[in-house]
């Protein structure tokens, strides 16, 4: 089964109030040979105020939040297409069960997309932090 290693950067540490502003992923086969990759960045959704500490942590400038061509909705559409294309796979990240999965579920739900794409049949998920523990 293929493995998707993915991560997000967000406008807040709170999954209820923040938005994904950047997401990237790498698709590898069972021998860890890279098959595909993507990295997308979008504008901050209109009316949202980013958390200053989140921007410091993910090294995002105000220009990056406002002058990118891709809208937040368009970015989520591209992510959905990519994840569907890469399925079936095991989705893996670092601390992603506690944060990234929650964030993408909420974002997909708000944009009327299927929110459980990373962990329902035929896909599975795992967390690198849990492996390390």
Model-derived segments and their meaning:
Residues 123-133:
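Short alpha-helix plus adjacent loop in nuclease-associated cores
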Residues 83, 108-112, 132:
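Short, well-ordered alpha-helical segments in soluble proteins
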Residues 1-107:
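Conserved non-catalytic scaffold segment of RNase H-like nuclease domains
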